[in-house]
Amino acid sequence: MSVEVQELAVHYGEAWAVHDLDAVMAMHTDDTVFHLHGGAEPASGRDATREAFAAALAQWPDIRFERKRVHIGEGHFVSEYEMSATSDGHLITCDGVDVIAVDGGRVARKDTYLDWPAIQRQLGEPTSAISA
């Protein structure tokens, strides 16, 4: 297990917990990529990634992540969590997984997978047979 990756995972989670976007972005490489699978096209580069994160925090200012497990590997970590946020006055919760590639002690890529059908059900939206 890489101590460097483990420390990054801890600090990254702490920065997200307090919505410190500057601290989050300081842990990303210049050519970082963020992909919210099923939600948007990948954001490539520091500026685009920051914009994507800022948009999420603006849409869900009370977003919280309760970590369930973190798996540390060589050059990556995987974070399993429960996300909660308020959308149009409704509290929504769903499971999520982040797969984070690390290069030089910083986040090179963040792939986020959320339980979109659970979010859609809680918002009263129809779910497709493919995403269910």
Residue ranges and their predicted role:
Residues 12, 24-25, 32, 45, ...:
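Hydrophobic pocket/interface hotspot
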Residues 74-83:
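A short hydrophobic beta-strand element
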Residues 28, 83-85, 114:
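Short beta-strand segments enriched in hydrophobic/aromatic residues
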Residues 59, 84-93:
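Short, cysteine-centered beta-strand-loop-beta hairpins and adjacent loop/turn segments enriched
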Residues 64-65, 92-98:
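Short, surface-exposed coil-to-beta transition loops
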Residues 3, 18-74:
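A solvent-exposed, acidic/Ser-Thr-rich amphipathic alpha-helical stretch
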Residues 111-132:
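Low-complexity, intrinsically disordered terminal/linker segments enriched in charged
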